[in-house]
Amino acid sequence: MKKYKIYFLLFTIFSNTLISQNLADKKVLVVWGGWDGHKPELFANHVENWLIKEKADYKIINGLDAYDNYDELIKYDLIIQSVTMDEISKKQEENLLKAVLSGVGIAGAHGGLVDSFRKNTNYQFMIGGQWVAHPGNIIKYKVKMLEDELTSGLSDFEIVSEQYYMHYDPNVKIIAETKFNDEIYPWINNVVMPIAWKKMYGKGKVFFISIGHDPDEFMVYK
């Protein structure tokens, strides 16, 4: 099988999602925190290595204090978030949503973006979905790439990770998908679920990819 770095899928689409240009001199905010089980600090480290390579102007913040100041948030071109099962204050949520609405991009992977704040439906509306289950936990499954400018040149692949089952907005543009089988829950056999999507929230671009239960998945050859 031809070797293929999975993280290329994530980071290439991050870059293209930003402004369809390279990241050199663009301002990027990386926010990590929440549940330690998703290794958010490791995710932030992998992203930092990529941002250094891309010559981006970046800042990394541990915790939701990153969203305290709206005037600071709107200075960024892109926010990359890895925060799972945390609680965001009303003001922090308002600042984040307003910043993206005004044109700041937001991107992330797995529960770090789509299971961040379970009580906050306005946040979920912005992102485009919410995790609800991962039948079978860590399993092998196929990822099918769909035709899109962001996936040009990318091939279908298999991965061992959590296969996310989500409630998602029909308005998202799905660019990669997976199909469930009947081994765990027979009633979801052949259900097709997004693996990655893009959408707009006001002027802001949103990108999500569901792989990445362990951030090292992005560094593994398949």
Annotate each PLM feature:
Residues 1-23:
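Bacterial Sec-dependent N-terminal signal peptides
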Residues 18-21, 68-71, 163-165, 196-197:
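Short, flexible, glycine/charge-rich loop motifs used to bind or transfer phosphoryl groups or to couple energy/partner
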Residues 21-31, 35-114:
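Helical hinge/lid and interdomain linker segments adjacent to catalytic or ligand-binding clefts
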Residues 40, 89, 116-119, 186, ...:
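Alpha-helix N-cap/helix-start motif
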Residues 51-54, 75, 129-208:
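Catalytic beta-strand/loop cores that center a nucleophilic Ser/Cys/Thr
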Residues 70-71, 206, 218:
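C-terminal catalytic histidine-bearing segment of alpha/beta-hydrolase fold enzymes
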Residues 86-153:
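A glycine-rich, often tryptophan-bearing local segment used as a flexible ligand/cofactor-contacting loop or short
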Residues 213-222:
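A short acidic/glycine-rich loop-to-helix N-cap element
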